[in-house]
Amino acid sequence: MTTAQVKEIEFFVSEKAGAVTGLLMKPNEARVLLILAHGAGAGMRQRFMENVAAKLSNHKVATLRYQFPYMQKRTKRPDPQRVLTDTVRAAVAKAKKEAGNLLLFAGGKSMGGRMTSRADAAEPLDGVAGLAFLGFPLHPSGQPGVTRAE
């Protein structure tokens, strides 16, 4: 098992959204940092997100898990897409400052992955070498379609 330092961080998203928190888990000898957004129903401290970060840490992959503003404020309804993609960009900017010489990847679980891909499709995420998704719904359950894939 690899030893990792865990640090709580805060970063500013926008005047409207305010600041959010994140958890940087950085194992010794890390070479990569994955910026990891949570899904719609559970935040960065949800068991799945913690397990993913811990297992990646064992393979010398650092993670930056972060909250979207609605989860930070403990409201149930996700923020508008613009706020979510602005949060992705703010998380990437913060990760660049924290990463040192680590190679950056970005992604997330479900909605977090989708918002990361939308942010990158609109304008490539600065300094990000690739994207990684942990569950990526292209349509709501029971409603097949491809509009989210376009």
Can you describe what each PLM-predicted range is?
Residues 2-10:
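Short, hydrophobic/aromatic-rich segments at coil-to-beta transitions
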Residues 10-103, 118:
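Serine-hydrolase catalytic machinery in alpha/beta-hydrolase-like enzymes
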Residues 88-150:
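Primarily recognizes the serine-hydrolase "nucleophile elbow" in alpha/beta-hydrolase
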